[in-house]
Regions:
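Alpha-helical transmembrane bundles and membrane-interface segments of multipass inner-membrane proteins
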Residues: 1-199
Length: 199
C-alpha cells in the first residue's frame, strides 16, 4: 500500500466510466451470445488447438456452469449485486480508478448473464478451455472474474482509503517503536541509579 498515486475520482467520472465500461462488457457479451445461438448446437470450432474451443452450452446454473437448477435465484442475486455496486460507487467517499473499472466490469457481466436467465431461462456459454478440466464460460464470466481482480487490486494497492490505513499503521508502528526506545532508556537510567546507590 502507499505505492502509486490514484486520487479519488469525482462522482461524474465514476458514473460515466462505470456506465461506459459496463455497457461495453454487456454489448460484447450479448453480441457473442447472439452469434453463438444463431449457429446453435452445430457450433464446435477449435480456436487454438489444445487450448480454446467454441461450443454452445445451455447453462441453467451460475457462472462457469456451476449451481445448475437455481437460475432464478442466481438472477435475483445478480440484480442485488448490481444494486450494491451502484450504491457503493455513488456513496463511497474514497475510491481508486481501478476499483471503478473493476466493479463496472462485474456489473456488466452480471447484467449480461441476468438477461439470459430472465429471458431464456439459461445462460449461453461457449468458451471451452480444453487444456484443463474447467467449465465452459462466456464473456460475462470473464468480465466478472477480471473485474473482481481489478477491483481488489485497486482497493488494496491504489485506493486513498487503503493508503490512509497504511499510513495510520505506519504511524502506529513508529509510535510503538518510539515508546519501546523510551522504555528501554528509562530502564537503563534506573539501572545506573541503582548501581550508583549500591556503591
Amino acid at each position: 500500500m502507499g505505492r502509486g498515486a490514484d486520487m479519488t475520482p469525482p462522482l461524474r467520472w465514476r458514473l460515466g466510466v462505470a456506465g461506459g465500461v459496463a455497457l461495453v462488457v454487456l454489448l460484447v457479451d450479448q453480441l457473442t451470445k447472439l452469434a453463438v445461438r444463431a449457429v446453435g448446437d452445430a457450433l464446435h470450432v477449435t480456436v487454438i488447438p489444445g487450448v480454446i474451443d467454441f461450443l454452445f452450452v445451455r447453462n441453467i446454473g451460475a457462472a462457469f456452469s456451476m449451481g445448475e437448477g437455481h437460475g432464478i435465484a442466481f438472477a435475483v442475486l445478480a440484480l442485488a449485486v448490481i444494486i450494491a455496486i451502484a450504491v457503493y460507487l455513488v456513496r463511497a467517499p474514497q475510491l481508486a480508478h481501478l476499483e471503478v473499472v473493476g466493479m463496472a466490469m462485474v456489473a456488466g457481466g452480471a447484467v449480461g448473464n441476468a438477461i439470459d436467465r430472465l429471458t431464456m431461462g439459461f445462460v449461453t456459454d461457449f468458451i471451452a478451455a480444453t487444456f484443463i478440466d474447467f467449465p465452459v464460460f462466456n464473456v460475462a464470466d470473464i468480465g466478472i472474474t477480471v473485474g473482481v481482480v481489478l477491483a481488489l487490486i485497486g482497493y488494496m494497492f491504489l485506493s486513498p482509503a487503503a493508503r490512509e490505513v497504511d499510513a495510520t499503521a505506519e504511524l502506529n508502528a513508529r509510535d510503538e517503536a518510539r515508546a519501546k526506545r523510551k522504555a528501554k532508556q528509562r530502564g537503563e537510567r534506573a539501572r545506573k541509579i541503582r548501581e550508583r546507590n549500591e556503591r
